[in-house]
């Protein structure tokens, strides 16, 4: 019996097994430009709305508030603030990590949105903690969000 010929849903069959699902996420125009700026210039960029003035990180092509086209890009700086965080003790495969990893949503001053990334050079984190992006050396960058190695705490 093939699935195309089943007319009674109670006749459908199932099977247990493992199915490979390889995929690629395409970044689009704004995402590609954003990562290229990180790779080539070690800059975190935002897109500014010409109508309502909102700056978006990561950048978008259109304002989600007023739908204006976003063509002005600006450097939002390397420093931000921990908005929220979590401490991971297991990896994506469910295996215990040797050392817990801190991940945080980093917000930048005057910006809508932010970046989720690792916190490094500390085992302490708190909401409101000031942090700064640490970029990989230029020769190691690949136009990936991981070109930012991590965010480190900064003194006030």
Segments from the language model and where they lie:
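Short aromatic-glycine-enriched beta-strand elements
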Residues: 91-105, 145-148
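Residues immediately within or flanking Cys/His clusters that coordinate Zn2+
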Residues: 43-46, 60
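A broadly conserved sequence feature marking short terminus-proximal activation segments
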Residues: 1-44, 149, 156
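Short, conserved beta-turn/loop elements at beta-strand boundaries and strand-helix junctions
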Residues: 85-90, 138
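OB-fold/S1-family single-stranded nucleic acid-binding modules
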Residues: 136-156
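Short functional micro-motifs and their immediate structural scaffolds
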Residues: 57, 70-72
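Short nucleic-acid-contacting surface segments enriched for D/E, G, S/T with interspersed K/R
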Residues: 120-133
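Cys/His-coordinated zinc-binding microdomains
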Residues: 53, 67
């Amino acid at each position: 019996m093939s699935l195309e010929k089943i007319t009674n849903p109670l006749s459908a069959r199932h099977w247990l097994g493992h199915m490979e699902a390889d995929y690629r996420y395409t970044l689009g125009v704004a995402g590609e430009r954003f990562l290229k700026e990180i790779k080539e210039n070690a800059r975190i960029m935002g897109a500014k709305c010409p109508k309502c003035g909102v700056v978006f990180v990561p950048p978008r092509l259109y304002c989600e508030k007023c739908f204006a086209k976003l063509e002005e890009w600006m450097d939002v700086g390397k420093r931000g603030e921990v908005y929220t965080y979590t401490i991971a003790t297991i990896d994506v495969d469910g295996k215990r990590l040797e050392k817990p990893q801190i991940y945080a949503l980093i917000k930048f001053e005057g910006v809508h949105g932010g970046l989720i990334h690792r916190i490094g050079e500390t085992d302490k984190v708190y909401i409101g903690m000031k942090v700064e992006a640490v970029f990989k050396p230029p020769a190691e960058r690949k136009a990936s969000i991981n070109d930012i190695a991590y965010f480190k705490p900064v003194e006030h």
